[in-house]
Amino acid sequence: MVKSCRRSFLKATGAAVAYAATPVTAAEESFALSYMLASSMYGKTNLEEILPEVKRTGSDSIDIWPMGHANQREQIETMGHDRFRDLLERHEVRLGMTTRYDLGPYRLQDEMNFVKAFGGHQIVCGAKNANGDTLKEKVSNFVKSLSEAIKLAEDLGVTIGIENHSGSLISSADSIKYFCDLSPSKHLGIALAPYHLPQDANLLAELIEHSNDKLAHFYAWQHGMGCHKPMPKPLELLQLPGHGVLDFGPAVTALAKIKYDRHVEIFMHPTPRGIPIVDGTAAVGDVINQAKEYMSRAIARTGV
C-alpha cells in the first residue's frame, strides 16, 4: 500500500511539474475563480494571525469554522463582534461564510443573522435523513423540511449550502442531482466536495453542469489517501489539487460552462482535526498558493 501511494504521489508531483512548464498569461485566463479561505486550514490559530493570509492567498473572503476542526467561530464570541469587525476592516477582509455542521440545517436562524450582519452570504452544513420509499422521495422530503430556513435565507439574502458528505442523505451522485432539481430557491444549493465522491473527473464535471445555478460552493479537494488516520505529511497533502491524481481540468471546464461566479476553497482535513495542515501560518498559505497555481494551470490548459 505504501509503495502504491508513493507511486501515486510521485506521479502527481511529476504531472504538477509538467504543468508548471506551461506559461500562464492573463490573456489565457478568460475564466477566473474567486477564492475563499477556510479558517480550518490553520487549525486553532488566532484570527489576528489568519486574517492577513486571506489577501496573501489571493482570496477575497474568509470561511469561519467552529470547534472540532478549528475554533475561530468561538474566538469571535470571545473577542466580541465589534472587535471582529475591526479586524476585518483593518485587514480589508470580508466574511464570506461560516461552516456549521454543529448546528445542522434546522438551527441556522441565529447564524444566518450573524452572517448577514457581517456582510457574508452563506452557511454550509450537512444534510439530515428524511422519510421516503425512494432516494428521490427522501431528498424531496428533506428539501421540504427546510421551507422555514429557506424563507429566512431568502429574506436575508443568505444561501444555505448543503455539503455532499459521505454517509449523509446527500452524498451520492444521484442524490446531488435530485437535491439540485428539487431545491425551490437559489438560496438552497449544493456545496460540492469532490473528496466525498468517486474520484472520476468526468463525473465531477457532469455534477457541476447538472447543479448549474444550484452550485453554491466548490471545494477544490480530492480524496487522495483520505483524512481519517495519521500518515506522512506528503501523503496527507494528496487531498490538495496538484498533489493527488484527480484531474481538475474537466471541473474547471464545467465551472466555466455554467459561468460559475461563486467561491472556490482550496481544502483538506489534517489528522488529527484542529491543527494546521502544515506547521507555520506562512507555510499553510504557501501550500494553498501552490494548489491555486495548479488550478490556474488547469484553466490555462483547458482553454476556457
Tell me what each language-model feature is.
Residues 50-67, 118-119:
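Catalytic domains of carbohydrate-active enzymes, especially glycoside hydrolases
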Residues 13-21, 48-51, 91-190, 199, ...:
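Active-site acidic/histidine proton-transfer and metal-coordination neighborhood
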Residues 63-83, 133:
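Glycine-rich, proline-tolerant flexible connector loops at the mouths of alpha/beta enzymes
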Residues 38-42, 65-67, 100-103, 128-130, ...:
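Active-site beta-loop-alpha junctions enriched in small/polar residues
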Residues 53-56, 87, 114-117, 148, ...:
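Alpha-helical scaffold elements within enzyme catalytic domains, especially in hydrolases
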Residues 2-34, 45-57, 173-188, 192, ...:
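Histidine-acidic metal/acid-base catalytic patches
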Residues 33-39, 62-64, 95-99, 123-125, ...:
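Hydrophobic faces of well-ordered beta-strands that scaffold small-molecule active sites
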Residues 76-82, 109, 138-146, 174, ...:
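Charged helix-capping and loop-helix junction motifs
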